[in-house]
Design a protein with these regions (language model features):
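Short, small-residue-biased leader/transition segments that mark boundaries at the very start
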Residues: 1-5
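A polyampholytic, Gly/Pro-enriched intrinsically disordered region
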Residues: 339-347
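Structured cytosolic domains appended to multi-pass membrane proteins
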Residues: 6-332, 338
Length: 347
């Protein structure tokens, strides 16, 4: 029954933010959100349904809230009359304004009066429009919950579309080898880790080859990843640039592989101290990459990829964890940190 409750996606705005959507005053928010939806639909490989924007008098004037179904998946405040100044590496001047944590990346930032923009920029701050702050947050939330936004109807629409060019493939795989609900489950699991599902032909061909193996939904998703990861890597770093990678030290990796082998179905049980150290090191490496405009990904042994990913994503929303079998051969990489579980080594 999870199909029904997911369908409603909305952004609720406090009364002070209504001007951001007012067509008369040229409020750009609705167009910007449509742009985000189209971009993410292209990246993820399915049409992301529209997001309703509506006012909500129970919210504070500057508050907004993002909902999927009944669940609140994000809320924060923006100041339409101000701009958000985000410090760079070299920013040493303290700006006067409203100090906040920026919602998408959790960085300290300051809402400054609009006329102070030039001064802020001359001190190394990046200055962002309020609409951009909100749409970036919306984009992050849709990406994070993409798996939950995909329903069986959406998958059927993707299949109908593919059937125009590959009718025999579609007929021979769904529902003969895989029922629609299982395929939906597999695609949702891929999306939950940002894996694009746009190459549906390849997905069905691979699933047809795996059909005799009796794999679970999770195992099927895992088996599909190496064939799809090239698309994801391309979205993270253009081909001309090396991919910024965080790895584990071989000692730590071997230890985790042993733990997974021993615990079997229970998955990876890390003691808190080790988990905390790892998360902290990964976080700081990732933040260093962000400061240089790169997005870092983790690359680990396929034997622990899935378990490790679910632990890490629990703490660091947008960290992508790839198995080393998933990296395209030709791809240049740049290892920016090696996590040892002791204290981190920077490269």
């Amino acid at each position: 029954g999870s199909e029904m409750c997911i369908r409603d996606r909305s952004i609720q705005l406090g009364y002070g933010l209504i001007e951001m959507v007012d067509e008369q005053t040229g409020g750009p928010l609705v167009n910007r959100i449509t742009g985000v939806r189209k971009q993410l639909s292209r990246n993820l490989g399915f049409v992301i349904p529209s997001v309703r924007v509506r006012d909500d008098m129970s919210l504070g004037a500057n508050q907004y809230r993002l909902r999927i179904g009944q669940t609140i998946v994000g809320e924060d405040e923006v100041y339409p009359e101000r701009k958000l100044a985000i410090p760079g590496e070299q920013s040493n001047l303290k700006l006067s304004g409203i100090d906040v944590k920026e919602p998408t990346f959790g960085i300290d930032a300051t809402w400054i009066e609009a006329h102070k923009q030039t001064e802020a920029e001359s001190h190394g701050y990046v200055v962002v429009e309020p609409e951009t702050v909100l749409t970036t947050h919306v984009s992050q939330v849709i990406t994070k919950y993409a798996g939950e936004l995909l329903g069986q109807d959406d998958v059927q629409a993707l299949l109908d579309n593919l059937a125009n060019s590959a009718p025999n493939l579609v007929q021979s795989v769904v529902p003969k080898l895989i029922p629609l609900h299982s395929l939906t489950g597999i695609l949702r699991e891929l999306l939950a880790e940002r894996m694009p599902i746009s190459d549906l032909r390849r997905i069905l061909e691979t699933l047809a080859n795996l059909a005799g193996k009796n794999l679970s939904v999770s195992e099927s998703a895992e088996a599909l990843r190496p064939g799809l990861a090239g698309l994801l890597v391309q979205q993270i770093a253009p081909l001309s640039q090396p991919l910024s990678v965080i790895t584990l030290s071989s000692e730590l990796e071997h230890m985790l592989i042993q733990m997974v082998r021993q615990s079997g179905e229970a998955g990876l049980m890390l003691d808190n101290a080790l988990a905390e150290k790892m998360i902290k090191s990964i976080n700081s490496a990732s933040e260093r990459a962000s400061a240089e405009g790169q997005q870092a990904v983790m690359v680990v042994s396929p034997a622990i990829r899935k378990q490790l990913s679910s632990i890490i994503r629990h703490h660091i929303d947008d960290m992508i964890v790839l198995g080393f079998t998933e990296l395209p051969d030709s791809r240049k990489i740049n290892v920016i940190a090696t996590i040892s579980g002791e204290n981190e080594q920077q490269n």
